[in-house]
Amino acid sequence: MTVSFPSTLHLHPILDVLLSQIPESCHSEVRLGLQEALVNAAKHGNNLDPSKSIYIRFRPIFRGYCWIISDQGQGFRPDREGADRNAYCYNGKEPSSLEDHERDCGRGLYILYHIFDQVEWSDDGKELMLYKRTSRWIFPSLFWNS
């Protein structure tokens, strides 16, 4: 499935579509993670420019689900300098120990790395791949005769 929309923070209907094919037991956690990723793409990638779009490809694979989120921004790579993902998120501190003004920077990344089993950016930093493992085998519908 592929979904695209202009940069916006009104994500409720988009999230509903993206969650429609995953087990309900995962909805709350995955909704939070996808919302953070989409807000980052709209706000930081596309600067909330409605003439720029966000594209999401979704696919069940192996024992989980994969989302690839693309924006039309300049690109982002938290690990470009070889930084540890937890060091980048909150400079290695636990979120609860941070001052209020420190919590916004890196909060979305912290959430992504704790919800999804795999988080990767493309070389140009314009695509984010998120993978969530589930406890059962997933068989994409293209393998089944209708």
Model-identified regions with their sequence ranges:
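Conserved ATP-binding N-box helix of the HATPase_c
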Residues: S25-K52
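Generic detector of short, locally flexible boundary/turn motifs and exposed helical patches
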Residues: L19-E24, R31-E36, D84-N86, G92-S97
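Bergerat-fold GHKL ATPase/HATPase_c domain
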Residues: M1-L32, S141-S146
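Conserved beta-strand-loop-beta-strand hairpin that lines the nucleotide-binding pocket
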Residues: M1, A42-S146
